[in-house]
């Protein structure tokens, strides 16, 4: 990946901070309340066992246990609502940050390799990474808080060796996970890379399927199969690495905790209250042992998600090709203004020519591969917000298309299925005209860079579009590449 030395790299922690908001803090507070209620239930179960030995157990005690444990479930469910809010806010902040950091990087617009690498993060990967990270944070904290508060109750109400057993099991299990963290992170990073590579192939599916060309479809399917197989292999390797360690740590955790419980029972063989408390809390302690295993194994899951967040961060500020302007062949380009034609040797010379007049049209001409579009992109990257750039194949947002789904945007020359049916969406030419009308009506730039603005227009619409471009040229400078004027 090309590194942009002019812009410092984004760290995963910076992106994680985007989750810090009011809903996130409410989620944390609710999780503490949930864990306290769960620990209170454990205390009441122990108390009920002791009351049973004294024939003092009341129905009220059972109802109280039911009520407090139910309240714990309700509070836990509510916390998920705030987790969802925090996730959506984090993703929204990410998109705003990405837009702010890259709005001046016009040179990257036509970089297909970069687009294939970065676009999956914009279209879904980052959204799922944030939610996976939130779910890991909430899940792990819920387990940790529940363990801490319940272990305190067990230690104070049954035997002080139980907290020591849980602490020892936690240290052993965590150490096992820690020693494997790098191997698991590498496996998941490779899994992410292969999955993105596979899903990026889908961006070209539409053209290869619906053109009906067997040659192109065969090549596309062959490439997809290779990427699908590589993605599956990487995912299986990542899962097996994590789950193998998970199974081993679960067995060790059970052995430590239940060995200690057996030792406590043996030392208190004549203490009915202690034995009943152990039996009464056995389901809870099995749950706690499972939760401890989940928490320590979840640490590597957290690291795996954190690694994926690192992938998001690494693609937050993609660097343009340093040899971008080498694609421009000045000796093969002509800049025509009215009846005069000029050639330029550098982008700076082209900028000087553009700023020589405040209005008027400059037509960029040259053979295919001479760098006409690259010149316009380079002009935009240097002139920045003083120029409005309309590239050849655009997915720019316009008012006329805001209420439409993406698949409704372009139907080419497709005809209605039945006589009298209204064709949904716009044809390429209709979209071109509406976009140009919006540009004329709602934008106010010093310079307009129009790349093949007439590419999809019939003669009548081309004349109308030319009039709109002429209107722009009366109030601003227009640098254009015309489809009609291709050499």
Language model feature labels by segment:
Residues 1-38, 83, 128, 144, ...:
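Membrane-integrated ABC transporters
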Residues 21-75, 155-163:
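Transmembrane helix-loop-helix hairpins at lipid-water interfaces of multipass membrane proteins
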Residues 89-108, 115-119, 189-229, 305-312:
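Short cytosolic helices in intracellular loops of multi-pass membrane proteins
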Residues 103-149:
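Juxtamembrane loop-to-helix connectors within ABC transporter transmembrane domains
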Residues 153-166, 241-312:
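Helix-loop-helix
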Residues 377-382, 428-448:
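GG-anchored amphipathic helix commonly corresponding to the ABC/SMC/Rad50 NBD signature/C-loop
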């Amino acid at each position: 990946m090309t590194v942009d030395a002019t812009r410092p790299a984004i760290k995963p922690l910076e992106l994680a901070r985007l989750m810090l908001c009011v809903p996130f803090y409410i989620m944390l507070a609710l999780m503490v309340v949930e864990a306290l209620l769960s620990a209170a239930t454990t205390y009441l179960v122990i108390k009920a066992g002791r009351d049973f030995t004294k024939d003092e157990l009341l129905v009220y005690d059972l109802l109280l246990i039911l009520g407090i444990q139910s309240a714990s479930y309700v509070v836990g469910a509510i916390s998920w609502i705030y987790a969802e809010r925090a996730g959506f806010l984090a993703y929204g902040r990410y998109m705003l940050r990405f837009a702010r950091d890259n709005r001046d990087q016009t040179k990257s617009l036509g970089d297909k390799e970069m687009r294939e690498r970065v676009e999956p993060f914009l279209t879904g990967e980052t959204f799922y990474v944030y939610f996976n990270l939130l779910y890991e944070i909430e899940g792990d904290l819920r387990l940790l808080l529940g363990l801490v508060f319940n272990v305190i109750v067990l230690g104070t109400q049954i035997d002080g060796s139980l907290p020591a057993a849980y602490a020892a099991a936690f240290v052993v299990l965590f150490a096992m996970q820690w020693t494997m963290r790098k191997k698991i992170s590498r496996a998941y990073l490779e899994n992410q890379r292969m999955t993105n590579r596979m899903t990026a192939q889908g961006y070209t599916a539409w053209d290869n399927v619906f053109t009906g060309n067997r040659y192109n479809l065969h090549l596309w399917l062959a490439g997809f199969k290779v990427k699908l197989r590589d993605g599956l292999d990487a995912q299986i390797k990542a899962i097996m690495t994590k789950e193998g360690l998970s199974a081993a740590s679960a067995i060790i955790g059970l052995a430590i905790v239940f060995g200690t419980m057996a030792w406590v029972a043996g030392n208190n063989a004549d203490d009915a209250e202690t034995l009943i408390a152990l039996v009464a809390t056995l389901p809870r302690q099995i749950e706690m042992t499972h939760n401890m295993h989940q928490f320590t194994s979840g640490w590597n899951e957290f690291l795996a998600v954190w690694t994926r967040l690192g992938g998001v961060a690494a693609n937050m500020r993609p660097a343009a090709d340093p040899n971008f302007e080498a694609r421009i062949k000045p000796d093969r380009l002509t800049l025509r203004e009215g009846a005069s034609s000029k050639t330029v040797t550098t982008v700076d010379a082209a900028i000087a020519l553009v700023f020589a007049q405040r209005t008027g049209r400059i037509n960029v001409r040259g053979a295919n591969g001479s760098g006409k579009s690259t010149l316009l992109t380079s002009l935009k990257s240097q002139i920045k917000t003083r120029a409005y750039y309309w590239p050849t194949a655009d997915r720019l947002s316009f008012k006329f298309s805001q209420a439409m789904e993406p698949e409704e945007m372009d139907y080419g020359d497709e005809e209605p299925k039945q006589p009298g049916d209204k064709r949904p969406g716009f044809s390429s030419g209709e979209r071109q005209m509406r976009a140009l009308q919006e540009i004329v009506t709602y934008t106010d730039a010093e310079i307009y860079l129009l790349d093949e603005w007439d590419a999809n227009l019939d003669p009548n619409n081309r004349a109308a579009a030319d009039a709109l471009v002429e209107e722009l040229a009366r109030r601003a400078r227009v640098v254009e590449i015309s489809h009609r004027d291709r050499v």
